[in-house]
Amino acid sequence: MSAVSESVLSLSRYYLPVYRPCQVVLVRGQGSRVWDEQGRDYLDLAAGIAVCCLGHCDPDLVAALVEQAGRLWHTSNVFYSEPSLRLAQELVDVSRFAERVFLCSSGTEANEAAIKLVRKWAAAQGRLPEHRTIVTFRGSFHGRTLGAVTATAQPKYQEGYEPLPGGFRYVDFNHIEALEAAMVGGDVAAVMLEPIQGEGGVMPIAPGYLAQVRALCDRYGALLVLDEIQCGMGRTGTLFAYWQEEVVPDIVTLAKGLGGGFPIGAMLAGPKVAEVMQFGAHGTTFGGNPMAAAVARVALRKLASVEIAANVQRQSVALRAGLEEISEAFGGVFTQVRGRGLMLGAVLAPLYAGQASAILEVAAEHGVLLLQAGPDVLRFVPALNVSDEELADGLVRLRAALGDYVSRCRG
């Protein structure tokens, strides 16, 4: 490690230690490559946790940001600004269901807004507080704020934050009988789920399950809330993951890829709930600021293109095939590769169970950046415009990294 790296990393003692970053100081990015301060390049198959959907420093996004930065940075929502209004209209138009949009700055804020909207809607229906329950699924991840982390049905994210807010109920993912049992009492106001669970191990929804959930929501008078913060904006091969199921939701939340790397979140509200929240019912200081909205408008246009959809589908096949070939080359490192589009998870074989974090470190040593989704799953969420050459290079580096790791394990 260079003296510069050591000097910069020494500053980490001033940062609340809630992260455990790879010991690399990144200083520049272009496309699906990033560089550290020593000039070493890395193939980025993590994309800032599925955020940099158009790669690093996409020229069109940079141009939009620079242009808006020279005009107007921030107004708050006390005043109108054109970029946020235009973005809201474009999200409504492209969503195929929404009537109104709430803009914020992150995914957890979008989910908090959705939770509050569900509760407001239930109250407007005359439902008592005990009849405003929200059902979520084990393995889910909806954010870190107190409401969102309570919706997140994973105890490891909740421990130590008790007492948690009430009014949530958890069921097993992809089990329709369990869901109906949780709803039959008539106290459920909404069902909230990710079409693909990201932090929960890259677990895709079972074919036909979302339609069954929609039917139960209709039967028991509940809203359907879809968290597409990670799986939306083209990542699964269609702009919205729910399009593949031909289901109409009531609320959809977005963030991550929507800004292409610039912080933004959005909650899309359908006709049942679009008019429920009126003046003063909710708000944000930074949400929908002109710079974020200007960048997101360009990102949305590009992510909705047929070119991006085609590339996601093609590279998904290549990435899946590459991972399966690498696994076979080393005696079955992975038991399966699951997911959709460019949101794939490689499940570690029992011999390597619990070692995802260690593998990530070795991968970085070999110049490829990955994520994990729990201790047993390597997560791959590259830029949606990743090129053939970039992906091939990433797979070469990953093969070398896994070969190195397997050799170390075998002594």
Swiss-Prot record:
Residues where N6-(pyridoxal phosphate)lysine is found: 256
Pfam families linked: Aminotran_3
Single Gene Ontology MF annotation: N2-acetyl-L-ornithine:2-oxoglutarate 5-aminotransferase activity
GO biological process, one term: L-arginine biosynthetic process
Cofactor note: Binds 1 pyridoxal phosphate per subunit.
Record bears the keyword Cytoplasm: yes
Entry-linked SUPFAM superfamilies: PLP-dependent transferases
UniProt: N(2)-acetyl-L-ornithine binding residues: 144, 284
Keywords attached to this entry: Amino-acid biosynthesis, Aminotransferase, Arginine biosynthesis, Cytoplasm, Pyridoxal phosphate, Transferase
GO cellular component terms listed in the entry, alphabetical order: cytoplasm
Annotated pyridoxal 5'-phosphate binding sites: 107-108, 141, 227-230, 285
InterPro entries assigned to the protein according to its UniProt record, in alphabetical order: AcOrn/SuccOrn_fam (IPR004636), Aminotrans_3 (IPR005814), Aminotrans_3_PPA_site (IPR049704), Class-III_PLP-dep_AT (IPR050103), PyrdxlP-dep_Trfase (IPR015424), PyrdxlP-dep_Trfase_major (IPR015421), PyrdxlP-dep_Trfase_small (IPR015422)
Pathway(s) served: Amino-acid biosynthesis; L-arginine biosynthesis; N(2)-acetyl-L-ornithine from L-glutamate: step 4/4
Main location: cytoplasm
Reaction equations catalysed: N(2)-acetyl-L-ornithine + 2-oxoglutarate = N-acetyl-L-glutamate 5-semialdehyde + L-glutamate
Localization of this protein: Cytoplasm
Alphabetized PANTHER family for the sequence: AMINOTRANSFERASE CLASS III, SUCCINYLORNITHINE TRANSAMINASE
Quaternary context: Homodimer.
NCBIfam families tied to this protein: argD, PRK01278.1, PRK04612.1
Extra remark: May also have succinyldiaminopimelate aminotransferase activity, thus carrying out the corresponding step in lysine biosynthesis.
Family: Belongs to the class-III pyridoxal-phosphate-dependent aminotransferase family. ArgD subfamily.
Protein name in the entry: Acetylornithine aminotransferase
Organism: Xylella fastidiosa (strain Temecula1 / ATCC 700964)
Gene that produces this protein: argD
